[in-house]
Amino acid sequence: EILKELIPNAGAGFYIEPPFHCDYGYNIFAGENVYFNVNCVVLDCAPVNIGSNVFIAPNVQIYTASHPLDAELRKTLENAYPVTIGDDCWIGGNSVICPGVTIGKGCVIGAGSVVTKDIPDNSLAVGNPAKVIRKLNQEPESKK
């Protein structure tokens, strides 16, 4: 009940392990079967669009907020850029998703990665900054 009030734009099977921190909640749009593990942070100053069947590991941080590099502008301005995570993704623990990033469908982001640029569908991306190291086979493992 409280979760639905905090994040009203989430589909069935949306679950968060506490503690969880967000700026607003109403800017988080999630499909069905989305799972946030413990200690996640979502700075949702702009929309955060999460597809269905997405697993987000412990300590993941999703940022839409940014600040100008210029010190004078930084005193008064904050920018926000939307983040999108496609269907069937797994975001590894301690990863950071930066403002304006789109992670395509079927992606795995390795633990501890810092995603600064878009990641294409069906990719395994790891590192700081995250780089695609290979495409993922989308055939279910049970059929191999």
What is the role of each PLM region?
Residues 109, 127:
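Conserved G/P- and acidic residue-centered "switch" motifs that form tight phosphate/ATP-binding loops
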Residues 20-30, 35-102, 128-130, 134-144:
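Flexible, glycine/small-residue-enriched loop-and-beta-strand segment within the central core
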Residues 6-7:
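N-terminal helix-cap/turn-to-beta initiation motif at the start of protein domains
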